[in-house]
Amino acid sequence: MPLSNNQKFYIAETVEEKALCNAVRNSNVNEALSLILKLIEANQFQKFNGDLRDRDPEETYYEVYYPLLSVAVLKRNFKMFEMLLEYGFKPHAISSGLNPETTPLIEASRCGRGDMVLKLTSILNKDELNYYDKDIKNSALYYAIKNNHVNIFNVLTSMTKGVDVDFEVSMEVTIISSNFNLFIHFFYNALQGIQDEVLRKGYLLQCAASKKIYK
């Protein structure tokens, strides 16, 4: 049975929880830190910011109080962003306030925040990246290409080595972008993970042909 609108996100119950949500939205780092420490002292922090990795991924984003990490990204507040990460707000567990199916990784790429992308990818391991659908990685890559953020593009493509990536989606995004430099870079970087030389050449030929069509 589908969840009703008022069931999709738990509501912050205590004064501290509501205040923390407001502090993050208002970019008040000092107040947010003070409230987090109060939650920890009252033994409420784990309940408020539980580790959701063991839950059904299809239900995970319904079981988050508030998308605080994504809000910090959208506010471009790196200090708040770092503080939330330090206190355990997991990037794979906190969904976007605008769309519950996106993550801070996508938001950071969309906002052009290379520092945030680098920070997120440095703490995400292979298992955590594969915990969500691979479209998340491709969506982050899409925004990097669309906005011509070469540094973010480089971080994301190096991150995909050894990780299951939908190459067809990534190829299409790179081709449509009509950014030839990124197009070439992608296939000599991300496709290094394909050991079969014939398969790798096949991808390159397919993309070269597609590039001509799109031109």
From Swiss-Prot:
Pfam families recorded: Ank_2
Q: Which UniProt keywords apply?
A: ANK repeat, Repeat
Q: Where are the ANK repeats?
A: 64-93, 136-165
Give the highest taxon in the source lineage: Bacteria
InterPro entries for this protein: Ankyrin_rpt, Ankyrin_rpt-contain_sf
- Listed as disulfide-bonded, the cysteine pairs are none
List the protein's name.
Answer: Putative ankyrin repeat protein RF_0783
Organism name: Rickettsia felis (strain ATCC VR-1525 / URRWXCal2)
